[in-house]
Amino acid sequence: GSEMCIRDSGNIMRYIPPVPYEEEVWFYEELDENVYLIKMIPGIKPRILRSVFENYDCIIVESFGVGGIPQSIADDFYKLCQEFPDRLVVMSTQVAHEGSDMTVYEVGHDMKKYCRFLESYDMTLESVIAKVMWMLGNREALGGNLEDIFYQNVNYDVIFGKNRKC
């Protein structure tokens, strides 16, 4: 079979093998729009956090670099994660080619102590938003664990994921 690849300046970045359809195609029509995207910037204030946690089912955190929460909001963020354990928190990054890696900085280690979160790895922010809205809106129909569903490859939205191997 033929293989596709993504090229960058003539260099092959990734092979994308063709995958035959193995099951019947299902269509899902529900989306959970109670998803909030918060972009981390240096000096961000914690004032908005309580309202976000109170009003949204999922908080997607777009950090700078490969992952982290600015110190200015870290304590408040961790407390809210513990106060609202049913909220889905997804850590994303603006450097999708590098992917998120919450083990790089101390704040990532702290987050793992205080918060239950999913990590976007090499997923684009658009893929994360669409997937979370789909997952939460169709939770019953999809069955299973949200973490397993999130990390399941859907149309190559996550290629490297947890194993980070090319």
Go through the PLM ranges and name each one.
Residues 2-68, 155-166:
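Accessory alpha-helical/coil subdomains and C-terminal extensions
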Residues 71-166:
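ATP/nucleoside-binding phosphotransfer catalytic cores, i.e., glycine-rich phosphate-binding loops
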